[in-house]
């Protein structure tokens, strides 16, 4: 479900704050979420008690089993909370915390992000703690409603930026599931990346085999849209450092 996030109308670079270096961490991620998320993200506010309770249980279980990896407890809690799906609490897809948060992150809504900076400190520091995955091809599925934007912006040879937190998967079948949410005609991205962070060992939904690409992930379109059965396919390769001199 997170795969569809971040298809910007104009996939260009957008400056973003370094929350790890510029934010004084609060004493408790859990308390920070309880105190700040309801007003900052009212769409998901009704689910905050459930999100906090479930994230606490999942994180505690992983800590007890020695499955926290390099993450500290607060970082693990923040990451688990990001992966939760409020449909398990009777919510709608658009009420998901990760969707509401990522919408504001893609918009670079300074005031809202400032209200969420304590949580983002722990989430981004968790991503920084995880080692980059070796370069390989990951998959991302988006429904057919995104096709017009993709046709306009993802021409072969172009560079694109994904401004938010982007979810991809090691499992192509997961991407196909997301791409088919609105029926045939969705798009499966093949993303060759070397900076992804595998979060599925710490996720509340590990079956999605989720890998996160950090904000402003830059790639070039190595192969434009092609039709493959019920799906369109598009190939991206993570770009190297800029060679422009200003």
Please provide the spans of the model-predicted regions.
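Internal glycine-rich, Lys/Arg-flanked active-site/core loops of soluble domains
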Residues: 41-202
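Conserved NAD+-utilizing ADP-ribose enzyme module
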Residues: 1-39, 43, 199-246
């Amino acid at each position: 479900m997170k795969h569809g996030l971040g298809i910007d109308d104009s996939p260009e670079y957008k400056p973003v704050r370094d929350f790890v270096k510029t934010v004084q961490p609060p004493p408790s991620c859990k308390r920070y979420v309880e105190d700040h998320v309801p007003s900052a993200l009212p769409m998901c506010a009704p689910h905050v008690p459930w999100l906090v309770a479930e994230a606490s249980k999942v994180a505690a279980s992983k800590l007890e089993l020695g499955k926290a990896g390099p993450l500290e407890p607060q970082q693990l809690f923040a990451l688990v909370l990001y992966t939760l799906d409020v449909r398990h609490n009777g919510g709608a897809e658009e009420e998901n915390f990760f969707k509401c948060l990522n919408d504001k992150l893609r918009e670079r809504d300074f005031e809202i992000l400032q209200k969420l900076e304590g949580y983002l400190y722990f989430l981004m520091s968790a991503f920084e703690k995880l080692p980059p995955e070796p370069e390989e091809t990951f998959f991302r599925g988006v429904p057919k409603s995104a096709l017009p934007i993709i046709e306009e912006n993802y021409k072969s040879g172009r560079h694109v930026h994904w401004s938010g937190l982007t979810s991809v998967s090691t499992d192509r079948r997961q991407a196909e599931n997301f791409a088919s949410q609105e029926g045939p005609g969705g798009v499966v991205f093949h993303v060759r990346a070397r900076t992804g962070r595998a979060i599925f060992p710490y996720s509340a939904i590990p079956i999605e085999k989720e890998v996160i690409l950090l904000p402003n992930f830059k790639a070039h379109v190595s192969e434009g849209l092609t039709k493959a059965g019920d799906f369109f396919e598009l190939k991206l390769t993570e770009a190297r450092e800029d060679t422009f001199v200003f």
